[in-house]
Amino acid sequence: MSVHGRFPASPPISLSPSSSSTSPSSQSPSTPPDLKQRVIACLNKLADRDTLALASAELDSIARNLTHDSFSPFLNCIHNTDSSVKSPVRKQCVALLSVLSRYHGDSLTPHLAKMVSTVIRRLRDPDSSVRSACAVATADMSAHVTRQPFASVAKPLIETLIQEGDSNLQIGAALCLAASVDAATDPESEQLRKSLPKIGKLLKSDGFKAKAALLSAVGSIITAGGAGTKPVLDWLVPVLIEFLSSEDWAARKSAAEALGKVATAEDLASQYKKTCTTALESRRFDKVKSVRETMNRALNLWKEVSTDDEASLSPSRSSTDDGNIGCFSSVTRSSTIDVGLKSARPKKVTPIMKRSPSLPVNRSYAATRQKENLPKRNQGNMTMLVEEASSVDNKGPHFTPVKKSSEETEEKANSGGPDIIKHTISEKSREDSKVSSFGGLRSGSRVAPCSDDGDSVKNCKDDVEESKKDSEELSLIREQLALIENQQSSLLDLLQKFMGTSQSGIQSLESRVSGLEMALDEISCDLAVSNGRVPRNSSGCAGDSCSKLPGTEFLSPKFWRKTEERPRNRNTANEMAAYDQGMRESTDTNNGQRGGSVFQKRSRRDQFQDCMHTTLQKPTTRLST
């Protein structure tokens, strides 16, 4: 096959003049003289299904074995391939860029702009597989060609997003931007942060059609640290929340993914926890399964974010202050916060001084506890214990070992051990009155440190969290039940309305049918009177008959249908004779027995209608119901 051969059932490969003419540098010994012929021949084979696999393997082999001098002619052959060729050819040309990036890496740095322009040229392709190959090629270039700054790849893609209006190109550029940011080793977050306002304008623009793909790119930028400042998050988070209610399910899914990345990647996420959690809670029951799962994952990520209020409620682990006695400064601060969290379950109390039982303060503390627990009849023993305690208190610097022990306990707590909750027992007036009589320490309060087992506190916090989760689940269940109740009530209203409409329709139909029957009787009577067959004062059509039929005022023109007038036929002799005989019998009977019963009148009317039935077998006009 020649160089300018044609694809089977497809236009030929077109090359620009610059690519068809061989430069002196391309004729170096390291470049085969038939490189272009081999590449174009393989591209021609790609259009044939039988030779597709063989041509793809050969092109990959050529791309892997290229030298520095052969990069330029090879890229020219790929770049100048006509866009009217078959889809496998276009896809393979882009895939070759991925092969080049993976095998040659930074050697392609001088040709990176050419490769990016080749990718952008293929982004208009209507075939989604070609655009996906462009995204893969962009990711490989961003990951393996690292000597050039990341802006050399991202900037052309962002400019393409802003300037172009083709929907396929917008989708492809957004996918390539997201792939390049995810694959880059140094995505230059500062440059991405500067480009976010432009992307935000595109998201708000009605003319931009690839909003779902662009939201995916925004999520990648957030992961790379491009939204790490409060001004950016102040406008970005409301935009993402707005897209949660979009009509496009892909946009809803991408917005939920971006919100989840804000929760995991940004340090300022705690300031937006309430807003984002509320928005995701209201949209978590989406009709599309994949969107619903994405929103639930994002909601769980936001629930794990700790707010500033929750951080302030954590146990204080600061060092001691100069204005307090030894280790008990932390006792006073932490007890006011955490003592309310203790449950009524039994606890294992282990005093801090239990580690050094020979300390004198331990005797003082034990004596004080025994003094409080003794009954009143042992006042003498209590006095001795208090004297011993007061004498021990005056012995000197006995708080030093206690402080050391407490500091060791605090170091253990700060190093990851269980939290120690300390409690202060203040009995100023009682201790002053009892200790002053013996000349003891007039401190005004007795501070007794006690350590609590960390399991009880942990269990208490777990119970609080479980109760919060249970309350949230109960509120959701109540909302669901209320929604179901509203739906059932609306369905019941619709059913009642339908039943009422059906009943009124049936009644209307019955009235119309009865009206038609009365109209038919009236017409038959009028016809008989007009022909002179029945006297006007006969009981069959008289106004004083007990079985008088309603007049024609009940009729409406909508009951009738105009038909073509037919010629009036004469009645046969037999029909006229039968009619005359019936009329005479009816007239004689009505004149002789006018005061008969209602039953007799109804029978006469039936006889009259039977007589008229024979006459009206061929009516002059058609009556339609």
From Swiss-Prot:
Point to the regions of Polar residues compositional bias: 612-625
Q: Where is the composition biased (Basic and acidic residues)?
A: 404-413, 420-434, 455-466
GO CC terms in record: microtubule
Statement: the UniProt record of this protein carries the keyword DNA-binding: no
UniProt keyword Amino-acid biosynthesis, yes or no: no
Task: List the molecular function annotations (GO) for this entry.
Answer: microtubule binding
Bias-annotated ranges (Low complexity): 12-29
Organism, scientific name: Arabidopsis thaliana
Q: Which UniProt keywords apply?
A: Phosphoprotein, Repeat
Under the heading Pfam families, the entry gives: TOR1L1_N
* Annotated protein name in UniProt: TORTIFOLIA1-like protein 4
Q: Where are the HEAT repeats?
A: 69-106, 110-147, 149-186, 190-227, 230-268
Residues modified as Phosphoserine: 475
- Annotated segments matching region Disordered: 1-34, 391-466, 582-625
Cited PROSITE patterns: HEAT_REPEAT
Q: What gene name is given for the protein in this entry?
A: TOR1L4
Lineage, broadest ranks: Eukaryota, Viridiplantae, Streptophyta, Embryophyta, Tracheophyta
